[in-house]
From Swiss-Prot:
Superkingdom of origin organism: Bacteria
Subcellular location: Cell inner membrane
Assembly information from the UniProt record: F-type ATPases have 2 components, CF(1) - the catalytic core - and CF(0) - the membrane proton channel. CF(1) has five subunits: alpha(3), beta(3), gamma(1), delta(1), epsilon(1). CF(0) has three main subunits: a, b and c.
Homology family: Belongs to the ATPase epsilon chain family.
Pfam families reported for this sequence: ATP-synt_DE_N (PF02823)
GO MF annotation terms: ATP binding; proton-transporting ATP synthase activity, rotational mechanism
rRNA processing keyword on record: no
Gene Ontology cellular component terms for the protein in this record: plasma membrane; proton-transporting ATP synthase complex
HAMAP family noted in UniProt: ATP_synth_epsil_bac (MF_00530)
Its job: Produces ATP from ADP in the presence of a proton gradient across the membrane.
Membrane topology: Peripheral membrane protein
Keyword presence, Lipoprotein: no
Name the UniProt record assigns to this protein: ATP synthase epsilon chain
Length: 133
């Protein structure tokens, strides 16, 4: 049997996942990456998207994250997510409401900082819409 890696997914609200799994596929800043046992150590940012948790030769669960950071070493991957929602709990209405709020924030933005924040909200909304599609 192949070695497993300890996966922990933490949001500001709570610890969502803490279990040994075969592999975790994370939406990294430079593209998706898979983390297995004995992975080379790294720290990276996580872009809005879906984390797929593989166990038993298949995707056992998927979680939408709004971004964050990931730390990987030979034994563990820890994702600190800004927000995390199991994909099964997402709805098209949630994604549409986020898009509407992001568009309103972009329309109301006056400063470059406000525009950047609204752009980030739109990225999260679009990633959420893709996750439920």
């Amino acid at each position: 049997m192949a070695e497993k890696i300890q996966f922990e997914l933490v949001s500001p609200a709570k610890l969502l996942v803490s279990s040994k799994v075969d592999m975790v596929v994370v939406p990294g800043a430079e593209g998706d990456f898979g983390a297995l046992a004995l992975h080379a150590p790294m720290i990276t940012t996580v872009r809005p998207g879906v984390i797929d948790i593989h166990d038993g030769g298949k995707v056992s669960s998927s979680v939408f994250v709004a971004g964050g950071f990931a730390e990987v070493n030979e034994e563990r991957i820890t994702v600190l997510a800004e927000e995390a929602i199991p994909v099964g709990e997402l709805t098209a209405e949630m994604a549409e409401a986020r898009k509407k709020a992001a568009k309103e924030a972009l329309d109301d933005a006056k400063s470059d900082r406000d525009k950047a924040h609204a752009g980030r909200l739109m990225l999260v909304a679009e990633a959420m819409a893709a996750a439920v599609a």
